[in-house]
Amino acid sequence: VLNLWSKLYAYIAQANQILENLEAHQDAIDSSISNSSLEKAAIQGSATEMLIGEVRFLRAYAYFTLYRYYGGVPLITKPTGPKPAYVPRATRQEIFKFLYDEMEYALSKCADNNSGIAYGRVTRGAVAGMLAKTKIFHASYIRRAEMYGDKIAENTTGELSTVSLYADAVKLCDDIISGVYGSYELEDYYPAVFTKRNKEIMFSVLAEEGIGTGNKIPMGFAGEAKYGATNGVHLTSW
């Protein structure tokens, strides 16, 4: 539990620093990317805005995960010093408002998966899918409070209705299916779901065989560990 908390807040701290740097050097970044990048045609607005959208989505993903494990957590959105000031836990309403603001921005700035953007980047399809999932979770927390009077789930005063949240989630999913946020469809051959660059994946963590980049779980990513080896211990045939 402590490991998850520490790693996600370290991730958030990195995101906060990146966002501050992007905003401080926007003109220089825009000019350098527009002059050299093959992805120029895929960018919605300026290059920096797209990068900011990607980082804000990833930061929101971290906060969404934290909320699922811990409930209300401190919302830290700016770089802090080595001894940051105390930040109280945010309420559910504050957390979800933050998540929606972050994802709506990302949805307006990130590129579609079929726009020529490099594979592995955050796309509008990934954002829309995560936004739908967030709304479903939000509705479920509200329902829990309504059904059980659960203090952990807090009260529902001033929150969106479960009906509107579920309706929003359905609309987002329908739009994903119909191609509003890129090109996605189910694979006809089930094992193909687990191969790279297939048409069903909306968001994935890229990895390089041999070094495990992007995932702490060695299975399938760390060279010889692809067959189950861990710390030099290999499986043998029966």
Model-derived features: where do they sit?
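Alpha-solenoid helical repeat scaffolds
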Residues: 25, 65, 69-72, 78, ...
